[in-house]
């Protein structure tokens, strides 16, 4: 496992990689970023929406910590997991109940992302996207949100025109959300990319890291500026850790430099 937060430290690992393998190092063609907490500023808004939706349906004791632990998962799966904690009668945890709670959650999120003045990209996101594009690396987003919420966010931050973001995938567009690899695979197919070793994944939760591993990505980078801390991400074996998106760019630049040698 390789853990670091500086581009320079990456070179030692890359040199070892290059020594051990005689075949050329794969060229990075695609970077897939998570949205809320990774590229979109979030102040527990998603976790609070979970709390409100569950409270409306008779589950007032869901904590922010419990909700945050489910960040990154598809939202119906997150709701099911939270119900398993707070509903002792398992027969009451039906698909119908989950759908009702999810509908309330979606409506809350649609209203929030459409109207709240705090919605913005995280620091350096657009600069990092532009730098990757100039390096010939496509940029994509995947998310535990459904497509309707995803589209609202893309419109609010000005990423819907395809200039900075080449593709996106929402959890309701694939058979299984994270940590399954289906969203990354959908994006790869859309962009005509066939080798997962030319793809890197970046996200702030355990399921982001595991999604990257399950997709066979070259790198699965955990970013510690969101929900999960470095200590919480390490057990899930990220190939790299970064404190922010600027450090992600340093990691990519260091890899590209070594790949040219």
Where are these regions (language model features)?
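Substrate-recognition/cap helix-loop segment adjacent to the acidic, metal-dependent catalytic center
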Residues: 57, 82-86, 126, 133-140, ...
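Short acidic capping loops at alpha-helix termini that bridge into adjacent secondary structure
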Residues: 62-65, 161-167, 195-200
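Short acidic, glycine/proline-enriched helix-loop-strand junctions
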Residues: 232-246, 252, 259-260
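Conserved Lys-Pro-Asp/Glu-containing loop-to-beta segment of HAD-superfamily phosphomonoesterases
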Residues: 178-209
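Acidic, Mg2+-coordinating phosphoryl-transfer loop and its flanking beta/alpha structural elements
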Residues: 201-240
């Amino acid at each position: 496992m390789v853990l670091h937060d500086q581009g320079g430290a990456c070179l030692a690992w890359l040199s070892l990689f290059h020594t051990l393998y005689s075949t050329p190092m794969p060229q990075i063609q695609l970077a897939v970023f998570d949205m809320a907490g990774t590229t979109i500023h979030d102040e527990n808004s998603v976790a609070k929406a979970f709390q409100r939706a569950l409270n409306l349906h008779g589950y007032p004791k869901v904590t922010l910590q419990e909700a945050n632990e489910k960040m990154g998962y598809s939202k119906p799966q997150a709701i099911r997991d939270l119900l398993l904690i707070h509903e002792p009668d398992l027969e009451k945890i039906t698909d119908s109940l989950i759908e009702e709670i999810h509908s309330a959650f979606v409506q809350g999120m649609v209203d929030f992302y459409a109207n709240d003045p705090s919605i913005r990209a995280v620091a350096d996101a657009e600069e990092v996207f532009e730098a990757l594009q100039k390096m010939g690396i496509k940029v994509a987003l995947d998310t535990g949100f459904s497509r309707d919420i995803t589209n609202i966010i893309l419109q609010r931050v000005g990423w819907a025109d395809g200039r900075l973001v080449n593709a996106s995938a929402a959890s309701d567009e694939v058979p299984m959300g994270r940590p399954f690899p289906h969203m990354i695979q959908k994006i790869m197919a859309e962009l005509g990319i066939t080798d997962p070793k030319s793809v890197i994944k970046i996200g702030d939760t355990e399921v982001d890291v595991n999604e990257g591993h399950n997709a066979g990505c070259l790198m699965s980078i955990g970013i510690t500026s969101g929900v999960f801390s470095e200590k919480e991400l390490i057990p899930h074996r990220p190939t790299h850790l970064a404190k922010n998106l600027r450090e992600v760019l340093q990691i990519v630049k260091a890899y590209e430099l070594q790949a040219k040698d």
